[in-house]
Regions:
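Extreme N-terminal leader/targeting segments of oxidoreductases
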Residues: 1-10, 28-29, 520-522
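N-terminal Rossmann-like FAD-binding beta1-loop-alpha1 element of flavoenzymes
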Residues: 10-35
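Glycine-rich loop(s) and the adjacent beta-strand/alpha-helix scaffold that form part
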Residues: 28, 39-50, 207, 220-224, ...
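Redox-cofactor-proximal catalytic regions of oxidoreductases
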Residues: 55-138
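A glycine-rich dinucleotide-binding beta-alpha-beta segment and adjacent secondary-structure elements
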Residues: 68, 181-185, 220-224, 388-396, ...
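Conserved redox-cofactor binding core of oxidoreductases
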Residues: 115-218, 453-456
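Mid-to-C-terminal "cap/lid" subdomains and adjacent gly/pro-rich loops that border
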Residues: 247-255, 259-380
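C-terminal catalytic lobe of FAD-dependent flavoproteins
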Residues: 344-435
Length: 522
């Protein structure tokens, strides 16, 4: 075990939204900050496009030690998840969408005081300014946007073009370029048009002296008998185990990463034995639900524009969700169109769940063999021309009743999601069918949901939730871990309920609040 000789005022674990925000705000106060990021640095042009190169595509460390890629896929007992790995965290692969949620979201009793929409608005403002967010230019004629709006109007639902963190018509920062409308936002922007964290919060923190150290996977945290904490981590390239000391620690490893580290610290290494018994509880997938439409009567050109242009808001009609129509570049949409609209028979639906966890090795094998590198020929039932296809993505207020538990060397998520959120799923499916009808096309939910009866979430929340006391959550309203002074959490794991809107704006606003609380105590 090697020990870093440097002593820091703060060690931040993770460089996603919460970590980068924490690093900047602490560095602005003259604090000596080290950020430990497990992934690598990606510059424009570095993001993988060949899915056959699975070690570059997927994060599977330490099971596969050379697989240090961009996407981490998990097939937990209760649902599947997709998260990012790299300097900038989820900002590298999200759809750039920044939405301030409906005030009703904060009426959920799980949100402690002082959190509500008006309290968070100044923090939302900070985030919006730093990311230079703005809607897709209204003058762009985008067939996919036009049709999605028309479907909302036909079904008498409210829609809007959300703020997005992208350089539409002029670069937001030096080193960036303008959007080429290539629909590759969620694959990592190889043109530098996304206003990812490395172009704003991270670069500004670095100017203040903050150090961002990549290839550093944290295993656990322990109190330092002298002062502060010791953070233990491993170099993912060499396997060398190291430690670093600091007065305070900010955990921002993402919902799954932060829960992993705390479960390790409490249950494996026994270094944080007094963590709240609420650890792992209150997990939410933010109601993520995917579907698709084939054979629209109108040409959609789904690869023209950013991934998301418009959001339909179902909240005003009393429903607890929103919907977007994310689409991708032409090669990917062509493959997706060839998969058709799945309608597995009763036998496949019955045995499908038995094979759910096998996807952990089946899917990488499918990628490596190039089976999804080109469209299926002939296409599966319901396959159509990709020009007339779109995806649908609903985000909703699930019951946030998932439970993260320690399983072997990893974690698992226990949750009877489909049973507990049956009404939400039914309402989403009905609304998607209505959109499909408005398109004059054929709608179907994501095949994995029909086969395995499990959703796949790209918006993991909770497990270390904000609360007024340790009987209700893991961190106080300031983001400080109950029972551990100067140990803070700033990421999606602290969010105490589902949001029903794209969550990055709220995760970031709460992180700004936490950073302000930390700085106030310096």
């Amino acid at each position: 075990m090697s020990r870093d000789n440097m002593y820091y005022d703060a060690v931040v674990i993770g460089s996603g939204f919460g970590g980068s925000i924490s690093a900047l705000r602490l560095s602005e106060k003259g604090q000596k900050v080290l950020v430990l990021e497990r992934g690598k640095k990606y510059s424009p042009g570095d993001f993988p496009r060949d899915v056959r190169q699975t070690d570059n595509l997927l994060w599977r460390y330490p099971k596969k030690r050379k697989s240090l890629g961009l996407y981490e896929l998990n097939f937990f007992s209760g649902l599947g998840t997709v998260t990012a790995s790299g300097l900038g965290g989820g900002s590298l692969i999200y759809a750039n969408v920044h939405i301030r949620p409906d005030h009703k979201v904060f009426e959920d009793p799980r949100w402690p005081a002082p959190f509500n929409r008006s309290y968070l608005d100044p923090y939302y403002d900070k985030v919006a300014t730093k990311f230079d967010v703005k809607p897709v230019p209204p003058e762009w004629d985008l067939p996919k946007r036009n049709k999605f709006r028309a479907a909302a109007e036909l079904n008498q639902h409210t829609y809007f073009d959300p703020d997005e963190a992208a350089s539409w018509l002029k670069p937001s920062r030096p080193g960036q370029s303008i959007c080429l409308r290539c629909a590759e936002c969620e694959f990592g922007c190889n043109h530098g048009a996304k206003n990812t964290l490395d172009f704003n919060y991270i670069s500004d923190a670095q100017k203040n002296g903050a150090v961002f150290q990549i290839n550093s996977l944290v295993s656990h945290i322990a109190p330092d008998p002298k002062n502060g904490y010791v953070v233990y981590y491993e170099n993912t390239e060499t396997g060398e185990k190291r430690s670093v000391h600091s007065k305070r620690v900010v955990l921002s490893a993402g919902t799954l990463g932060t829960n992993r580290i705390l479960f390790n610290s409490r249950d494996k290494y026994k270094t944080l034995p007094n963590l709240s018994k609420q650890l792992g509880k209150g997990y939410s997938g933010n109601g993520d639900f995917l579907g698709g439409i084939e054979s629209s009567k109108t040409e959609l050109k789904p690869w023209d524009g950013p991934d998301v242009t418009t959001v339909i808001n179902y909240f005003p009609k009393g429903f607890q969700f929103t919907m977007a129509a994310p689409t991708f570049n032409q090669p990917v949409m062509t493959v997706l169109a060839s998969l058709g609209i799945s309608k597995p028979n009763w036998l496949l639906r019955m045995i499908g769940p038995l094979f759910w966890k096998s996807l952990e090795w089946i899917l990488p094998l499918v990628f490596k063999k190039g089976l999804l590198s080109k469209p299926l020929s002939p296409g599966l039932p319901g396959a159509g021309d990709p020009t007339y296809m779109t995806n649908l993505f609903a985000i909703g207020r699930d019951n946030a009743n998932g439970k993260i538990v320690r399983r072997g060397k990893n974690i698992d998520v226990k949750w009877k999601y489909s049973k507990e959120n049956k009404t939400l799923i039914q309402n989403m499916t009905t609304s998607m069918q209505q959109v499909g009808d408005a398109y004059g096309g054929q709608f179907g939910p994501l095949a994995t949901f029909l086969l395995f009866n499990r959703i796949i979430s790209v918006h993991s929340l909770g497990g270390c939730i904000l609360a007024s006391n340790p009987d209700k959550g893991v961190v106080s309203e300031t983001g400080e871990v109950f029972g551990y002074k100067n140990l803070f959490i700033a990421d999606g794991s602290t969010i105490p309920s589902s949001i029903g809107f794209h969550p990055v704006m709220t995760i970031s606003a709460v992180a700004e609040h936490t950073a302000a609380s930390i700085c106030a105590g310096l």
